[in-house]
Amino acid sequence: MLAVAFVGATGTGKSLLSLDAARDFNGHIVNADSMQLYRDMDIGTAKLSHSARQGIPHHQIDVIDPSSEASVARYKLSAQTCIKHIHALNSIPFLVGGSGLYVSSVVHNLQFPPTDGRVRKLLEDEADKSGIGVLHDRLLKLHPGFTVSRGNRRRIIRALEVAYITGRSPNPVLPLQNRANNFIVINLICDKGTLDIRLQKRVESFYDNGLIDEVRLLQEKYVLGRTAAKAIGYKQAIMYLAGEISCADAKDSTLQETIRLANKQIKWFRRYSGQHIVDTTDMSVAYEQIRSILNKSFRIS
């Protein structure tokens, strides 16, 4: 049975266009934005409010606390279960998000090496005590050909965890399989000038709509996990509340990181084969193109 994946950079209109499509084609939304998995992180993740969802069922949103760490392997299994459930209801699953590995885990049915919480905890503790550079050096001694940024703590720790558990090269994801032929992939792109304006407005709206207060409440309610505390926008708000940076600097840093994220997302999804590329510079024109793609795919006259 067919499913649809809306992918693309932040700011290209995935949430709104997929919502329109789900409304017109009897669909459910399955979130594939890793940060929207977290409860109470609403403003800085651009999570649609319940009223904005227009009654369209949404899955894989608000499923873990910000004190926990999301797992792409667990997410894949949960998302696949959601998709099967939606098909059983004779509805169409719309997988929507810009978190490349999360999308790919479902669309390409990625297979992940095992995990070991005890090993992970030992590595996390060592990184806290000695610095991630020590673990990075060890990783390169074990596997000189493995490429990872010295500051990428999560990937370094995961790579060492895999190496220790399996005794093999620490490739965090097993080789990419061909895209499942039951996924229609719609990659949303946008004119760079338009996207830059959208991202600037997006960041302004975060702060205008109360991101600082949201973060203050999060800190009161939870001991934030590493991922939540380092999320774009949230990291800057935490620094502002700690008196480390000004609000203006927090906004500027959030915008620059958002732009870098968008560029990474564009490069990631560009690699997908067999996709439909839709330019969302004009949203109304884009949706007509999307309707045409879906009508043909589902043979609706």
Curated annotation (Swiss-Prot):
Protein keywords: ATP-binding, Magnesium, Nucleotide-binding, Transferase, tRNA processing
Matching InterPro entries: Dimethylallyltransferase, IPT, P-loop_NTPase
Keyword ATP-binding attached: yes
Database matches in Pfam families: IPPT
UniProt: substrate binding residues: T10, G11, T12, G13, K14, S15
Binding site for ATP: G8, A9, T10, G11, T12, G13, K14, S15
EC main group: transferase
Gene3D superfamilies: 1.10.20.140, P-loop containing nucleotide triphosphate hydrolases
Transmembrane regions listed in the UniProt entry: none
Catalytic activity from the UniProt record: adenosine(37) in tRNA + dimethylallyl diphosphate = N(6)-dimethylallyladenosine(37) in tRNA + diphosphate
Single GO biological process annotation from the record: tRNA modification
Known EC number: 2.5.1.75
Site (Interaction with substrate tRNA): S99, R120
Cysteines engaged in disulfide bonds, as pairs: none
Region (Interaction with substrate tRNA): 33-36
Recorded GO MF terms: ATP binding; tRNA dimethylallyltransferase activity
Cofactor: Mg(2+)
Assembly and interaction partners: Monomer.
Task of the protein: Catalyzes the transfer of a dimethylallyl group onto the adenine at position 37 in tRNAs that read codons beginning with uridine, leading to the formation of N6-(dimethylallyl)adenosine (i(6)A).
Family, similarity comment: Belongs to the IPP transferase family.
Name used for this protein in its record: tRNA dimethylallyltransferase
